């Protein structure tokens, strides 16, 4: 007979043995882990690994003028575990800080909600961007404060007060960016706006490390193994911009006390010669320890100086858009250069009327461009959308029209190397069907023919239209950076794109734009010897109309294409044309005539009252 008590004892004994063995294995594992921890702690006590920050790349204008460079800056950091016995009163005296400020700062550093990476064994920021006086005072007394260190970095400096929104600025990296990119640590600087953000990886360089030896008291004794284990920092790459800083300064001066933008492009290369967003600001405001305060004030400004209107703002292009319509009508065979349309004070269809200013009627294409006849382009669109050549009727014609617009760079981002570029708006047939059902016709959408209605473009897209016409049908994606030190720019900044319109059609538009300058709405841009071609734009607005201009010069072998857009500036000839003319004269002639200097002074002093509402 089985002895069940004996069997039970065997199982219990086996269980006890297994439990003891498991306990010993766990303890051995823990001891091994602790030994590794103790080894790491011992090594950390013996050595201090210091991050060496690289110099950020400089920025130059197209003529080699230094725009952005670096100035040395020093931070005070500390390792809490090493700084436990520091005389806080003496430290506060050395830094010109009260004890209350000291303890408040320490509380913020130790607060893991504010500083999730906090550890008493790791380096923490204490004071950043010391003034020269603070640096000298602390360096002299640094030996009194074990566990506190000086860290050399650099902040940006600027040689000019212009182009702030283009150049951008640097600020402390966000927590979310640190989580996404292991390169960054708390307190690191990163490009936050403009080219500093777009070209962050090229500009930032590569951080290095310096391994320093400590004594038994934690004091730094010097380099470990004569720097054998150090990793040198690699400085950032310099950028040569396409920007002409003198042209940029003139543009910003002309736009003082106004809201709007200017974009100038070299047609052959797509290089942006100037890009003004008004109101502008001095880029040096966003450097140093006052950066946060100044950034907050600029952010609160209802005129939005931190917004780059040239790429982020979308506006009705007004009559500058008529050139794209003429190109489409010519290429589709809707009109010829000799086609004339009547203008009875505007476009009149049944009981609908879209007004126009006084000029001769009927008129063919080139005089229609020169006089900016609304009726001509409305009749052209009406003929296209009513044409029997499109089997799908108005909807097919509408989508064909949109194909032309997209090929000219509208309705999508062009791909400029600046953050925040907007798409603008080019509607298609589905858009109108959604809003009007199947009952819309050409007359329903007729205002798009003159750059109104649902059509919106960025000032950059308007300037690119000018560059495309100047090139007779091709453009290169507009860009701000001409060259990167030791690297190449993107391929699409070197490769021409073609529109759906042939060169011959463009020649007719060029002649019409030249006629606008010699005998039309752009006569204020008729500068002797420059052969300017232009097109005004007066974009309707709920308040006062916007003043726009798009042009290029010279007529043959053009060197500059430009768009000017002044919010609530009235007629295109009031602000757009004279500002555009002055900038083309400056760029092509190298300087302004005495008469033009007087005109520039007068325009810069003009004030447009925008009230107190947000823009």
Identify the residue ranges that each predicted region occupies.
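Periplasmic/cell-envelope proteins involved in peptidoglycan metabolism and beta-lactam response
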Residues: 1-290, 314, 336, 397-407, ...
């Amino acid at each position: 007979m089985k002895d069940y008590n004996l069997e039970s004892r065997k199982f219990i004994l086996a269980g006890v043995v297994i439990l003891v063995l498991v306990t010993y294995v766990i303890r051995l594992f823990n001891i091994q882990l602790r030994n590794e921890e103790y080894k790491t702690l011992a090594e950390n006590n013996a050595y201090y690994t210091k991050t060496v920050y690289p110099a950020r790349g400089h920025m130059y204008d197209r003529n080699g003028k230094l725009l952005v460079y670096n100035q040395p800056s020093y931070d005070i950091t500390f390792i809490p575990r090493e700084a436990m016995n520091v005389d806080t009163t003496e430290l506060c005296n050395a830094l010109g800080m009260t004890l209350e400020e000291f303890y408040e700062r320490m509380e913020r550093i130790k607060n893991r909600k504010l500083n999730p990476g906090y550890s008493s064994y790791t380096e923490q920021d204490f004071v950043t961007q010391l003034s020269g006086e603070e640096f000298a005072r602390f360096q002299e007394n640094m030996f009194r404060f074990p566990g506190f260190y000086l860290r050399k970095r650099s902040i940006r400096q600027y040689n000019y007060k212009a182009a702030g929104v283009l150049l951008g600025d640097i600020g402390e990296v966000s927590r979310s960016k640190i989580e996404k990119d292991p390169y960054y640590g708390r307190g690191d600087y990163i490009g936050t706006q403009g080219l500093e953000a777009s070209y962050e990886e090229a500009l930032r360089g590569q951080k290095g490390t310096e391994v320093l030896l400590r004594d038994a008291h934690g004091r730094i004794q010097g380099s470990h193994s004569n720097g054998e284990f150090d990793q040198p920092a690699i400085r950032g790459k310099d950028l040569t911009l396409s920007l002409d800083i003198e042209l940029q300064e003139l543009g910003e001066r002309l736009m003082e006390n106004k809201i709007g933008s200017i974009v100038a492009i070299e047609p052959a290369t797509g290089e942006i010669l100037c890009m003004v967003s008004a109101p502008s600001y001095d880029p040096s405001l966003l450097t140093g320890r006052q950066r946060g305060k100044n950034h907050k004030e600029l952010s609160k400004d209802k005129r939005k100086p931190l917004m780059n209107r040239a790429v982020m703002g979308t506006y009705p292009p007004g009559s500058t858009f008529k050139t794209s319509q003429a190109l489409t009508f010519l290429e589709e065979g809707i009109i010829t250069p000799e086609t004339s349309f009547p203008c009875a004070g505007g476009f009149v269809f049944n009981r609908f009327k879209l007004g126009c200013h006084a000029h001769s009627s009927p008129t063919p294409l080139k005089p229609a461009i020169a006089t900016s006849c609304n009726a001509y382009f409305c009749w052209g669109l009406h003929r296209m959308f009513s044409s029997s050549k499109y089997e799908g009727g108005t909807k097919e014609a509408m989508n064909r029209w949109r194909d032309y617009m997209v090929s000219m760079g509208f309705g999508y981002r062009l791909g400029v190397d600046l953050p925040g570029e907007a798409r603008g708006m080019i509607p298609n047939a589905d858009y109108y069907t959604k809003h009007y059902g199947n009952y819309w016709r050409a007359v329903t959408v007729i205002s798009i023919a003159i750059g109104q209605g649902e059509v919106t473009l960025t000032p950059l897209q308007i300037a690119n239209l000018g560059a495309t016409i100047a090139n007779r049908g091709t453009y290169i994606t507009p860009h701000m950076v001409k060259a990167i030190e030791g690297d190449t720019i993107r391929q699409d900044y070197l490769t021409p794109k073609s529109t759906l319109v042939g060169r011959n059609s463009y020649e007719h538009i060029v002649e019409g734009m030249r006629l606008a300058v010699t005998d039309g709405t752009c006569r204020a841009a008729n500068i002797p010897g420059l052969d300017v071609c232009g097109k005004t734009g007066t974009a309707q607005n709920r308040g006062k109309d916007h003043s726009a201009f798009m042009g290029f010069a010279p007529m043959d072998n053009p060197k500059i294409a430009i768009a000017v857009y002044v919010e609530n500036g009235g007629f295109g000839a009031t602000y757009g044309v004279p500002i555009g003319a002055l900038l083309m004269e400056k760029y092509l002639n190298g300087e302004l005539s005495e008469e033009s200097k007087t005109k520039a002074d007068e325009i810069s002093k003009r004030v447009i009252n925008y009230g107190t509402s947000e823009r």
